Regions:
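Long, acidic (Asp/Glu-rich), low-complexity accessory segments flanking structured domains
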Residues: 1-21, 33-178, 184-401, 405-473
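Short proline/glycine- and polar residue-rich coil/turn motifs
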Residues: 504-511, 552-555
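C2-type phospholipid-binding modules
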Residues: 234, 242-247, 414, 522-528, ...
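Hydrophobic beta-strand segments
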Residues: 6, 74, 461, 483-487, ...
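Exposed aromatic-hydrophobic patches
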Residues: 511-522, 550
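Short Trp-Ser/Thr-centered turn/loop motifs at beta-strand boundaries
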Residues: 495-507
């Protein structure tokens, strides 16, 4: 490769080196002095380019002889990381990541082996214990946040977009545990699914149920809820019931579980492998129920997004065959928290985002209490015709379980949803904090200055560097990104906060910041942390490059790599951030974060920070 060809290569991988440094590095690696790099020289050039001086600095802080890490040196590092600091674990890491035979034989780790280890999944910022199902799955359903999709069949907007089975497959493969089916009378007696009174296309109900049968439990063994928005005639409701029974077979829950109170909610563990129907139930079908066959909140949702002047009377009669498939998730109109408290836990109310927000502002504590007993479903405003999303965190703060989002619309709100359900094996159920599950809780999401859920901690995050950031897809091939990093806290209102690093000019390959932020997190059990990288632009809005969101309680302290994700939530490998994290007791409770340097020491012990 000539020098000009090397420059083209650097541009392709988003590296903008100064002319002086690029030529100096080229000449250093051109050992044959023929103004070209052969295969071996290209390898040396890339190795020099890929050097991680910030990792070398960490390595040297722990190396007793500045050459290698002994098992004792590595043990000290692991201790400061808050990990298993046994010599046996240190030895196993050397055997796994050290490629130099002499070093491995003598139980040493070289800088290259250390880099391999630091870049491995073993050093991810997400607690590996939380990557599996680790929570108690035997609580009632109301004690869990449940990953939920709104108008699952839509591929785009709410008025003209196509309906398809593909969004069901994607949602189920991502661990979604509540999908929505808007059911209407179709031709030849076959019910269809589409967004009623709009120009969205129609798909047969039977096709969706067949897809659900195939994909329901591929990503999670825990119960799947079918949220039926029923606008069908009694005759086609009966067809729906027959198709549900014949296709889903014994996966479909058709009666209360034996040995359990039929008026209490079972647990995800009790309902493993079962599909539940959420819908209205015939009046009096469940003793003590306040359910009626009148228009429910869910039906109101459909009317709010329908084309004006194209309304039809809502269905007021229910098919007994379909009604009897509704067991633990009976849709009812919400009257008041006091009224709901007297009714069975198997009743479920749907709230528009605006109604839910009003209840949170006016009666936050009572909404949390309600959600310790019954399920609540939240759906987007009918004004969101382009399928935009509301902030799900506000609803989780009140303990709402079924917070339905438009999965087809990527963005910050879906990042938060993916982050919320990243833990617990991505099974679609995460256990709510204990203070949200007590019937008499005094937790109020609008005020966590004290009382339940208030256990402030100091979160210190040091953004050290990034690696191999992509260019925005629409950028010119010759452009180089100017990255900056946001660190965001999403949680109780008192905790919502974000800070950004300065931008680095013309370096998406290995930008260095070494910038430290302090945050006080008052309700850590509710908080999410979002790392977001964007391309700074002086003349227009900044372009999104990548992000990663996870529960605050799933963070690992120490030096970690944050593996960035694309806007659609898929992997952006090898793009990552290199960070240092500490979480410690909070001596004071400032409501805003501060920025300073250098970083605090890790909480587990005193670290040798660079």
């Amino acid at each position: 490769m000539s020098y000009e060809e090397v420059q083209t290569l650097l541009q392709m991988i988003n590296v903008d080196l100064s002319e002086q440094y690029a030529r100096s590095l080229f000449q250093k690696c051109d050992r044959s002095a023929d103004s070209r790099l052969d295969h071996e020289e290209i390898e040396i050039f890339c190795r020099e380019l890929l050097r991680r001086p910030e990792l070398d600095t960490v390595f040297l802080r722990y190396s007793a002889n500045d050459c290698v890490l002994s098992t004792v040196d590595l043990r000290d590092f692991l201790k400061d990381q808050g990990e298993d600091a046994s010599l046996l674990h240190a030895q196993s890491l050397i055997l796994t990541y050290e490629l130099n035979e002499w070093a491995q034989k003598n139980q040493f780790m070289t800088p290259n082996g250390f880099t391999m280890y630091m870049l491995s999944k073993e050093n991810c910022v997400l607690n590996p214990e939380h990557a599996r199902v680790y929570q108690d799955m035997t609580h009632p359903l109301a004690h869990y946040f449940i990953s939920s999709s709104h108008n699952t069949y839509l591929t785009k907007d709410q008025l003209t977009g196509d309906s398809s089975i593909e969004p069901y497959i994607r949602a189920l493969n991502h661990g979604c545990r509540c999908v929505e089916l808007d059911c209407w009378d179709g031709d030849k007696g076959e019910p269809v699914i589409y967004h009623g009174h709009t120009l969205t296309s129609k798909i047969p109900f039977v096709n969706v149920i067949e897809v659900i049968k195939e994909y329901a439990f591929k990503a999670s063994p825990y119960p799947l809820i079918l949220s039926l928005e029923n606008h069908c005639s009694v005759e086609q409701q009966t067809v729906m019931a027959q198709q549900l029974r014949s296709i889903l077979g014994d996966k479909l829950l058709t009666k209360p579980l034996g040995g359990l109170d039929p008026h209490s909610l079972p647990s995800p563990e009790d309902l493993k492998g079962k599909i539940l129907v959420k819908g209205k139930k015939e009046h009096g079908a469940v003793e003590g129920s306040s359910s009626t066959s009148e228009l429910s909140s869910s039906d109101e949702e459909a009317s709010r997004t329908s084309k004006k002047g194209d309304q039809k009377p809502s269905v007021s009669k229910l098919s007994p065959e379909l009604s009897e498939l509704v067991v633990y998730t009976c849709s009812v109109s919400f009257k008041s928290f006091e009224h709901a408290a007297r009714n069975p836990a198997t009743e479920l109310s749907s709230f528009s985002e605006s109604d839910a927000t009003r209840h949170i502002k006016d009666s936050g504590m009572y909404f949390v209490r309600h959600n310790s007993h019954q399920l609540s479903r939240i759906y987007p405003s009918g004004q969101r015709l382009q399928s935009s999303n509301y902030n799900p965190q506000e609803m989780w703060n009140a303990g709402c379980q079924i917070v339905a989002l438009n999965f087809q619309t990527p963005g910050e709100q879906m990042d938060l949803n993916q982050g919320r359900f990243l833990q617990n094996g991505q099974c679609g159920y995460t256990l709510k904090p204990p203070f949200m599950c007590q019937p008499g809780t005094t937790f109020n999401p609008e005020n966590v200055g004290g009382g339940p859920g208030h256990r402030p901690v100091l979160f210190t995050v040091r953004i050290i560097s990034a690696q191999q950031l992509p260019k925005p897809e629409w950028d010119k091939p010759s452009s180089i990104v100017d990255p900056q990093v946001w660190v965001e806290i999403h949680g109780a209102p008192i905790d919502n906060n974000k800070k950004k690093t300065p931008h680095i000019d013309n370096n998406g390959f290995n930008p260095q910041w070494d910038c430290t932020f302090n945050f006080t997190v008052h309700a850590p059990d509710l908080a999410l942390v979002r790392f977001m990288v964007e391309d700074h632009d002086y003349t227009s809005s900044n372009d999104f490059l990548g992000q990663y969101t996870l529960p605050f309680t799933s963070l690992r302290t120490g030096y970690r790599h944050v593996r960035l994700l694309k806007v659609d939530g898929s992997t952006l490998s090898p793009a990552s951030l290199f960070v240092h994290i500490t979480v410690g007791p909070c001596e004071s409770s400032p409501s805003k974060s501060s920025t300073k340097s250098p970083a605090r020491s890790p909480t587990k012990s005193s670290a040798k920070g660079p």
